[in-house]
Amino acid sequence: MPSRLRKTRKLRGHVSHGHGRIGKHRKHPGGRGNAGGLHHHRINFDKYHPGYFGKVGMKHYHLKRNQSFCPTVNLDKLWTLVSEQTRVNAAKNKTGAAPIIDVVRSGYYKVLGKGKLPKQPVIVKAKFFSRRAEEKIKSVGGACVLVG
């Protein structure tokens, strides 16, 4: 049967309030706060706060990250960077005006030579070209333009 009163109400009027006799429920038996993290509270600190103690390495100020960032695209994916309409117009166009594909605008920096190009001239703008890519683009009558 549930009782009507909470435990604290029941203990009123009893000197020790459930904490034993002389000096039992004492002040701070384990030390205050985080005291003893390396000693008597070691297990708690190791389990729930790993890495709390000890030294950490130095901060490298002015570190230049991603200096070698150079996303690449292959020749076989080159025509996917422009719209289908541009591709159709370039195939129909016999006047010799080659379409311009700027791979830097599509998020790539370097053009690699994997795959084949269709036999129509194209102007490719990129920051870097591999030797094979440059040869293949020029073999279909295109041009390689170095940007920035």
UniProtKB/Swiss-Prot annotation:
PTM sites of type (3S)-3-hydroxyhistidine: H39
Residue numbers carrying N6-acetyllysine: K47, K55, K110
GO cellular component: cytosolic large ribosomal subunit
Post-translational modification: Hydroxylated on His-39 by MINA.
Keyword Iron: no
Keyword Acetylation: yes
InterPro entries (alphabetical): Rbsml_uL15_N (IPR027386), Ribosomal_uL15 (IPR030878), Ribosomal_uL15/eL18 (IPR021131), Ribosomal_uL15/eL18_sf (IPR036227), Ribosomal_uL15_CS (IPR001196)
Listed GO biological process terms: translation
GO MF entry, a single one: structural constituent of ribosome
Keyword annotations of the record: Acetylation, Hydroxylation, Phosphoprotein, Ribonucleoprotein, Ribosomal protein
Modified residues (Phosphoserine): S68
Superkingdom of origin organism: Eukaryota
Region (Disordered): 1-38
One Pfam family, short name: Ribosomal_L27A
Biased composition (Basic residues): 1-30
Alphabetical list of SUPFAM superfamilies matching this protein: Ribosomal proteins L15p and L18e
Family: Belongs to the universal ribosomal protein uL15 family.
PANTHER family on file: 60S RIBOSOMAL PROTEIN L27A, LARGE RIBOSOMAL SUBUNIT PROTEIN UL15
Name used for this protein in its record: Large ribosomal subunit protein uL15
Native source species: Pan troglodytes (Chimpanzee)
